[in-house]
Every structure is written in C-alpha cells, then in structure tokens.
Amino acid sequence: MDSAIQSAKRIIIKVGSSLVTNDGKGLDTAAIQKWAEQIVQLRALGKEVVLVSSGAIAEGMQRLGFDKRPTGVHELQACAAVGQMGLAQIYETSFRQHQVQTAQILLTHADLADRERYLNARSTLFTLLQLGVVPIINENDTVVTDEIKFGDNDTLGALVANLIEADALIILTDQRGLFSADPRKDPHATFIHEAQAGDVELEAMAGGAGSSLGRGGMLTKILAAKRAALSGAHTVIAWGREEQVLTRLAAGEAIGTQLTAQTAQLTARKQWMADHLHTAGRIVLDQGAVLKLTAEGKSLLPIGVIEVSGSFGRGDVITCVDQSGRAIARGITNYTSSEARRIMRKPSTDILSILGFVEEPELIHRDNLVLL
C-alpha cells in the first residue's frame, strides 16, 4: 500500500497515556525523550508535526500522592492541573536538547465550537508551525466536565487534524492495529493492513461490547479516522512500542493499519460545523426531507421538520436526525427553537403569517449545512 505518512507534509501524532507513563504512575521521561527524538527526525525531513499527548492526570496523581485514580471530578481536575506542569516541563526539556521549541495548547470543545475561537486557535497553530515550533496539545481537563469533554484524545487528534488541514493522523496505541476480530479471543482473527476511513463494516465490527473486535478502544480510533478523513487526512493506527515507529512510517514502511481518506474534502466552514460534538439543539426530519438533503443536496424547509428539541438561537449549529434518531446533518439555523416549533410542518409561504416576519424561506440553507 502507498504510505500516507511518507508523503504527508503536516502530521498530527497522538500518543496515549500508556506510552508516556510508567504503567499510569507518573511520566516515563525516557519514553518521552525517544518520542522527541523521532519527531525531530521527522522535522528534518521537512514535515510539520503537532503532538497530542495524554499523561497529565497520571503525572498529577503521582505528584499529589494518589495511589489510585480518584473518582471525584475536582480531584481529577486538580491532578490534571498539577500534572500538566510536569508534562510540559518534560517535553520542553526533551525537545530543547535538539534546539527545538515547544508550545503548550490546552483546548476545550467550547474553543472549537465557537467560530471566532476556532479561527484563533487555527491561526495560532499555523503561526507556531511557521516559526518551527512543535505544538503539544491536550484537553483542558481542569475546566471541562463529562458533558462537554472531547471524550478521548483520539477524537481530539482528529479535530486538530481538521482544524489545521493536516495530511495525516498517527494514532499510537498499545495494540498493533485493527483485526477482523479480537485476537485474544479468536485464533482466526486476521490483521487489517488497510481499509477506507468511514467503512461502515469496520465500524460495525468495532461497535459495542458484543462486537467481533470487542471494546478495547478501537471504535474511538475508527471514528477518529472517519472524522479526520472529512478534511482529507489519512490515519495510521500503530503499536507505539514498535522500534522507531515514527521514522519508519515516514520512510514509507507499512506499519499498523492505514485508514485512507476517500471522501471529498469539506470546505473550512462546513468542516467547522461537522466538528461540533455538542450542538445547541436537534430537529427530527420526515423521510421526504431526509431524501431532499441526502440525495438531492437541497436546503431544509420547515415543512420537513416534525420535531424540535433543545433551546437554540439564530445562527446556532443544530443537528438534523431522521425518525430513527440517526444523525443526518448539522447546520446553522435561520430561526430560533421557539420559532422553529411554530413553523415546523408548515410551507415556507406561511412563515410571514405565523411569525410576522421572514428571515429566510429555509430553516437551514444548503450552504450552511453539512451531511454526516
């Protein structure tokens, strides 16, 4: 297979906690130094690298004397706050040995959901890369709650790939890559060297406790690859303990599973809409409206809406679902939730008589709508 990493100019590398900590108890300085060495070698090949690294909570636990991971939200946030200092210090020291500057960037979903903050983060990252800096990104665990978390750094890595239009996403994990079934349980499981990002069969294999691949965190990686593919980024899932894995990938060696992006690249504006993990509201569409959106590329009219939930204002991003609850699209609404409830199931010609004004004949214009 063609190596997505060898030809990539801009790469996001996600390193999981198990690869930068001592069995979850504090940071592994030697391991981090090796990652820094490999990234420096990638930069020498002319590649721009952004690192998404876990490990802050594990380091904070050690510094604060926790024997096991706390269950309280505030204790976890305290561990993250303390541990992030150590994580930044070790990365800075490791890269400065090679005369490379690093930058710490902590993101939340709110940063990427707000259009202005999204563009600011994008501009900052581009500027850092132009200055030859290696940005090191993590979720800002000190301020987020479960309801607004990215959920995992696989997802964060994909969102950053989209944010700066990276060519490739490398997800380093404690497994070799993807198998057709859980190799720990099925001796006939075969290794998947290459597949298409967004392959529904692959998602089905990895989904849920009863799936053939088991849980094992692989579904989040498959979904991250699907998300990264929206901006044209290819994904490689590889074993992080593989010797010199990054430099060998950059040299064109086939390691791990490569999930290839084959979908049309979204515009930057539509990419921003697609990357909303949490939207302001949800509307349910009838079958006719679903077909108009998915098969004909039409705008969404009020007559095709059968239910409105949530509280949203004009200009908010909302999710469109079919009657089974499956997400079909996201888009920027022309009407508030209360207005949408009044005009749903009505023809656009009735909007003026119902509301006393007409913003637009469409609830969501097709230029402000992205299919999922």
Swiss-Prot record:
GO terms for cellular component: cytosol. Its main location: cytoplasm. Pathway: Amino-acid biosynthesis; L-proline biosynthesis; L-glutamate 5-semialdehyde from L-glutamate: step 1/2. GO terms for biological process: L-proline biosynthetic process. GO terms for molecular function: ATP binding; glutamate 5-kinase activity; RNA binding. It comes from Herminiimonas arsenicoxydans. It is found in: Cytoplasm. Its EC number is 2.7.2.11. Keywords: Amino-acid biosynthesis, ATP-binding, Cytoplasm, Kinase, Nucleotide-binding, Proline biosynthesis, Transferase. InterPro entries: AceGlu_kinase-like_sf (IPR036393), Asp/Glu/Uridylate_kinase (IPR001048), G5K_ProB (IPR041739), Glu/AcGlu_kinase (IPR001057), Glu_5kinase (IPR011529), Glu_5kinase/COase_Synthase (IPR005715), Glutamate_5-kinase_CS (IPR019797), PUA (IPR002478). CDD domains: AAK_G5K_ProB, PUA_G5K. This is Glutamate 5-kinase. Coiled coil: none annotated. Substrate binds at residues 54, 141, 153.
